[in-house]
């Protein structure tokens, strides 16, 4: 499946617009990850713990969006946008939303 941030796919004609499609993931960040990330930040390094969590959440949201597009009969998703939001009273949750337009192209 072609997934792109552009509104069209070069060299392909969009034959049918299936509709807007979403993929959402909410991921909690636990105490051990917070502690490891805090040490990394203290010593001036990058927080691989949080980066890995972010990458994993983004990949899951994209896959969920792709699966929903397939269920709609699409073979591509155009105009993809990914949003990130921190949730919870202690900012302990990360929400990643992938959205786009499911299309059928030649």
Curated annotation (Swiss-Prot):
The Swiss-Prot or TrEMBL record describes its family as follows: Belongs to the UPF0145 family.
Protein name per the record: UPF0145 protein CLH_2273
Entry-linked InterPro entries: UPF0145_dom_sf, UPF0145_YbjQ-like
Q: Which SUPFAM superfamilies does the entry link to?
A: YbjQ-like
NCBIfam families xref list: PRK01119.1
Gene3D superfamilies on file: Hypothetical protein apc22750. Chain B (3.30.110.70)
């Amino acid at each position: 499946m072609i997934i792109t941030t552009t509104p069209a796919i070069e060299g392909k004609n969009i034959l049918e617009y299936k509709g807007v499609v979403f993929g959402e993931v909410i991921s909690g960040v636990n105490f051990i990850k917070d502690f490891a990330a805090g040490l990394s930040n203290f010593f001036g390094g990058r927080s691989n713990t949080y980066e890995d969590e972010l990458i994993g959440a983004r990949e899951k949201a994209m896959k969920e969006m792709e699966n929903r597009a397939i269920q709609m009969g699409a073979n591509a998703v155009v105009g993809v946008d990914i949003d990130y939001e921190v949730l919870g009273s202690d900012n302990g949750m990360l929400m990643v939303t992938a959205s786009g337009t499911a299309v059928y192209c030649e």
